[in-house]
């Protein structure tokens, strides 16, 4: 089955993409990588280093022999999402894309607006 996982760089999306790939599904991750920008802006890092998405996908292929496609795109970009759906033709869409950063949204009004705009 062809499956798109949005938010595939995140806490829930990444392991879900791995699980689905391991089960034999054709997985495409869609992520805008905004979580990494927010963490950098907040000066917040993971307790354990997290490799960039492209590197993690390469390691997954090395250990499993399975490919996971990656599309860097914002779900609020209609043209990008339309192209991805046209190209991939998924049979399922697993949606984990979200801002999970309350501290980011409380910096000021502009950050709160951006958090809500991009929290599809």
Feature map (PLM): residue ranges:
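N-terminal Rossmann-like NAD(P)+-binding domain of SDR-like oxidoreductases, especially those catalyzing
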Residues: 1-120
